[in-house]
Amino acid sequence: MKKSGLLVIVMACAAAGLYSQTFTYIGSAKCAICHKTETQGRQYPIWQGTKHSQSFAALSSPQAAEYAKQANVQNPTENPDCLKCHAPLCEKSAELKAEGVSCEVCHGPGSDYKKLNVMKDVALAKQNGLIVYDSQDAIKKQCLTCHANAHGKSFDFAASFEKIKHNKPAQ
């Protein structure tokens, strides 16, 4: 009886570990290793060519200074209201802060899905933290967390999506 009770406790602890797994952010440079070629969909170079990759740097621009002045913000590069959209992972590390709106902002922390054998199996990658959107509406909902009337500007999802969309890698 004692052995079976111990086995139940060990199994319960192991199962709890599976469901309380925490993933860590690794930075977009790790994503670039695989996601830069035409074969893989060029996700990284596409991201580099968008305002997302420059969103934190934009907080140091004259335009940001004007927005900050209007909003009574001293330093937009340190203001939580600015950072929540311009550098959503800022509290994780200085590197992630500088990346602005990086791969992992939309696709989740890559520590456990970054390996090729995991990425080749979408279900396994999802189990390991990858966020994959199942529809354009789901993508739009994610975008609107920051782009809904940002700075008083309307958001044209269709036009904006054309600038950032990237192909899924070949399976």
Regions found by a protein language model. Give the residues of each.
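Sec-dependent N-terminal signal peptides
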Residues: 4-14
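Sequence context of c-type cytochrome heme-c attachment sites
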Residues: 18-98, 104, 110-137, 157-171
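Cys/His-rich zinc-coordinating modules
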Residues: 141
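Short, exposed beta-strand-loop hairpins at the edges of beta-sheets
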Residues: 145-159
